């Protein structure tokens, strides 16, 4: 049987002392306590020893000063008198000890209390409580006292002289297999557990026993510093899109309704623009917008939606509700020459919705938006790009179904298949409507899509509540 050198040392203690069992505190003179516990656990796994734990009640001395009744007797003895008026006890004892002294005198019968006086017949009386306190100094285990003594110990506890505590007694015993094992000589030879340069050069390794490593032994998990799970997904998506040839763009968090809604052909009376869905800035409450572009967008809205376009609504400042505003800003910034070139851009950033917080909604979350502009791109190209993107994210089964979005036509939703959960919606996409592109002078088709990171993170980490993604649960953050 392969034994560690410390296992051999512990078993040799049993062998040298011709004993089958030891208390832990007895073994501590041979080996440190922590090592004994660790080695005995190894030997227990090999069925060579067994351990037995017993919890013992111990008595702790809280104070060792004289009883107040003994203080009275000693005072009288010093003054060669045998009685004292109760009202004069304040000269001998603190106020809080007087009642305790009177109660003890009555209970023990060591003096008489008559006509407001305490009268002692014997100032050198014997007190079993004092004798027991002395015994407790020499023996702390409650089980070693008689039932009568335990009653007195309870009195001492009430008087605040002692208290109880618990102590574990651990016994390490040889099993039958262990007893058989120590019948044979146990040799403690030099053992090398870690090869060093000096050991190799000196040649010590030739004569010593080199302990083999068990690579299957469980080890304590190590939790190094980690990036937050949501940040990891954002970085992963960014790397995938950059590898697919996209360029990252940014736009402001605070937007005008013009860039967030009007430019995307969303009518000004659309429900999504109401207070319950959008955060409006109180101050400043209006922003600047390009007047020439405003007039073009106004003309498209009034011609197609048949309503009176309000320019003041367009100037209102809000927290952006989607990152599509980044895409449309990018397209509007292109020069005539740049409009003739293909473009692939994406934006990953925070968006805001005025929604009640629950298991699947937060007022602030991350979104990814991407567009592709080229002469010959079509709906099939959009499906192909999205399928490749989702495959790279680790979703093998992907399917698409028709959908409706105000600023794309045709539109679709992508679903991914997860074992045990079935098909789940993950992103929306489509081709920008001509009414979106007309005011900025773009005639080429533009493919667009968007994905929410919160939903993606929930799928990736198996969460059922989106709020868990933002909790300070260190155990979960260490594991994922």
Swiss-Prot record:
* Enzyme class, spelled out: ligase
Q: Required cofactors, per record?
A: Mg(2+)
Q: Which gene encodes it?
A: pheS
NCBIfam families recorded: pheS, PRK04172.1
Could you give the subunit structure recorded for this chain? Tetramer of two alpha and two beta subunits.
GO molecular-function annotation terms?
A: ATP binding; magnesium ion binding; phenylalanine-tRNA ligase activity; tRNA binding
UniProtKB keywords: Aminoacyl-tRNA synthetase, ATP-binding, Cytoplasm, Ligase, Magnesium, Metal-binding, Nucleotide-binding, Protein biosynthesis
Q: What is its EC number?
A: 6.1.1.20
**Major localization class:** cytoplasm
- In terms of superkingdom, the source organism counts as Archaea
Question: Where does this protein reside within or beyond the cell?
Answer: Cytoplasm
| Species classification | Archaea, Methanobacteriati, Methanobacteriota, Methanomada group, Methanococci
Q: Name one GO cellular component term.
A: cytoplasm
**Biological-process GO terms, alphabetical:** phenylalanyl-tRNA aminoacylation
What residues bind L-phenylalanine, as annotated?
324, 407, 432
What family does this belong to?
Answer: Belongs to the class-II aminoacyl-tRNA synthetase family. Phe-tRNA synthetase alpha subunit type 2 subfamily.
Catalysed reaction equations from the record: tRNA(Phe) + L-phenylalanine + ATP = L-phenylalanyl-tRNA(Phe) + AMP + diphosphate + H(+)
User: What PROSITE patterns has UniProt attached to this entry?
Assistant: AA_TRNA_LIGASE_II
Give the co-factor note.
Binds 2 magnesium ions per tetramer.
Which residues does the record give as Mg(2+) binding sites? 409
Name-wise, this protein is Phenylalanine--tRNA ligase alpha subunit
**Parts of the chain that traverse the membrane:** none
